[in-house]
Amino acid sequence: MFNFAPKQTTEMKKLLFTLVFVLGSMATALAENYPYRADYLWLTVPNHADWLYKTGERAKVEVSFCLYGMPQNVEVAYEIGPDMMPATSSGKVTLKNGRAVIDMGTMKKPGFLDMRLSVDGKYQHHVKVGFSPELLKPYTKNPQDFDAFWKANLDEARKTPVSVSCNKVDKYTTDAFDCYLLKIKTDRRHSIYGYLTKPKKAGKYPVVLCPPGAGIKTIKEPMRSTFYAKNGFIRLEMEIHGLNPEMTDEQFKEITTAFDYENGYLTNGLDDRDNYYMKHVYVACVRAIDYLTSLPDWDGKNVFVQGGSQGGALSLVTAGLDPRVTACVANHPALSDMAGYLDNRAGGYPHFNRLKNMFTPEKVNTMAYYDVVNFARRITCPVYITWGYNDNVCPPTTSYIVWNLITAPKESLITPINEHWTTSETNYTQMLWLKKQVK
């Protein structure tokens, strides 16, 4: 039975349906799957409940389009193509009693097909289904000197002792936990900022590092995940650019102009593995663990990492670099098989195929030292990963590639309906999973 509740309350590993509300006022924008109020409703129901098929099997999807909940006999235009790639077929179908079945076809190789739908060229939706994704493999090579490269960089960074300035933030402190604004010097040239929350009650606690999603930004909502501190965790939410969250808007604007464009740092120095911007970021994550494990109220056993998108990537990177990490949670990880477009299929965020001259031999070589797939190979702690099939930021193709490479104990919450988001319920569930990992 369909549930037309205005808010999603549960995510299941195998979703039967995708319900997509498309706001009329946002009709020309890329619509998320669950705006809470809308006049229009798409329903797309693959004929396999888990949205997965074997290569060679044909996928069929029942499509419905409703206005105010009433089925519409409208013409639907559609295009079908591989995940993140140009369409290879297109067509139109007129709905009868508000419904039609579209044959999406199949794939000869493992991957995902994406069907992009529209009514009147305005009301848009898409749905992706997978074909033997458990067989997907990375394009990215595993450099022979990968481990030596990162050991040398961490050794060099550790010549600079971790130094921390720590100021209590009364406006974020409650009866249950204390909050501190930290500035951590992570190597000779770089520092990061972070908010540390920890239980008010004296004791020994697990530590959790939370790296950020992509962008040039400060930490805007330090109170959004305080349920960690309330459940007995010391948690550090960090940024990666040395941007003080208490700076003024004018200061922020002045500093960020140096970054060229919003996520330009992800291309900065990509010609040379030793000069790539993300080198100090990966090192900073490990140095943050150095700091957390020096705290007198750390329990001496449990070191967790948790994040989404770029933060999911950095969580996996840290787990692959640092054997002290005892459990890892990642949502739809970015920076995964970034050169995958050279295999004529989807690659990972930041989608270098959209820029010029990004796949030179030098840049592809550098990518291999920073790609999540090569850290995933090295993870030994338990891992919990969540991803959705409709994600066009961190596509399911690359999430599966990362998942397939992990040989450590692992669990997944696959939510086919999801684009680039998770619900608050999922985020809380991940905290509960970490709680189960406490030794």
From Swiss-Prot:
The UniProt record lists the keyword Iron: no
Domain of life, source organism: Bacteria
EC number from the UniProt entry: 3.1.1.-
Signal peptide: 1-31
Pfam families: AXE1
Pathway: Glycan degradation; xylan degradation
pH dependence comment: Optimum pH is 6.0 with glucose-pentaacetate as substrate. Active from pH 5.0 to 8.0.
Catalytic site: 309, 391, 420
Keywords: Carbohydrate metabolism, Hydrolase, Polysaccharide degradation, Serine esterase, Signal, Xylan degradation
GO molecular function annotation: carboxylic ester hydrolase activity
GO term, biological process aspect, one: xylan catabolic process
Thermal dependence of function as given in the entry: Optimum temperature is 40 degrees Celsius with glucose-pentaacetate as substrate. Active from 30 to 50 degrees Celsius. At temperatures of 30 degrees Celsius and lower, less than 10% of the maximum activity is left. At 50 degrees Celsius, retains 60% of its maximum activity.
Biological role stated in the UniProt entry: Involved in degradation of plant cell wall polysaccharides. Has acetyl esterase activity towards a broad range of substrates including xylose-tetraacetate, 4-O-methylumbelliferyl acetate, glucose-pentaacetate, cephalosporin C, and acetylated xylo-oligosaccharides smaller than xylo-heptaose. Displays no detectable activity on polymeric acetylated xylan.
Family: Belongs to the carbohydrate esterase 7 family.
Protein name: Acetyl esterase Axe7A
Gene: axe7A
